[in-house]
């Protein structure tokens, strides 16, 4: 009797459908908590952050069949570049964001413009 139950249990597990990965899927920063079931051959949740100093970071989240993460330090991502982060558990891309926040980059741009304007003012006064 125990053997029959064991065989039934093994058959039930072997024939049950595999659980698909669930990821947040969105195309912009405004709607980035949107859980969806990924296709069966997609094994990664992928977050791609485009660094845009004037518009802030643009975030895209999706299911992916392959993914390679980029690693960067805060403040070392140049404007116009993208940072990719990957994970492999359900809804793991909910909180993944770029290591270079848009506000920090915007502050750097503002500081650079202020410095340039100051130098131009000093040069104009010296002439």
UniProtKB/Swiss-Prot annotation:
It holds the Pfam family Toxin_TOLIP. Residues 1-20 form the signal peptide. One of its GO terms (cellular component) is side of membrane. Keywords: Cell membrane, Disulfide bond, Glycoprotein, GPI-anchor, Lipoprotein, Membrane, Signal. One of its GO terms (biological process) is response to stilbenoid. InterPro entries: CD59_antigen_CS, LY6_UPA_recep-like, Ly6D, Snake_toxin-like_sf, Toxin/TOLIP. A lipid is attached at residue 98 (GPI-anchor amidated serine). It is a lipid-anchor; GPI-anchor. Disulfide bonds join 23-45, 26-32, 38-63, 67-86, 87-92. Residues 99-127 form a propeptide. Lymphoid cells lacking Ly6d, called ALP (all-lymphoid progenitor), retain full lymphoid potential and early thymic seeding activity, whereas cells containing Ly6d, called BLP (B-cell-biased lymphoid progenitor), up-regulate the B-cell specifying factors Ebf1 and Pax5 and behave essentially as B-cell progenitors (at protein level). Thymocytes and B-cells. Residues 21-108 form the UPAR/Ly6 domain. The keyword Glycoprotein applies. PANTHER family: LYMPHOCYTE ANTIGEN 6D (PTHR16982:SF2). May act as a specification marker at earliest stage specification of lymphocytes between B- and T-cell development. Marks the earliest stage of B-cell specification. This is Lymphocyte antigen 6D. It comes from Mus musculus (Mouse).
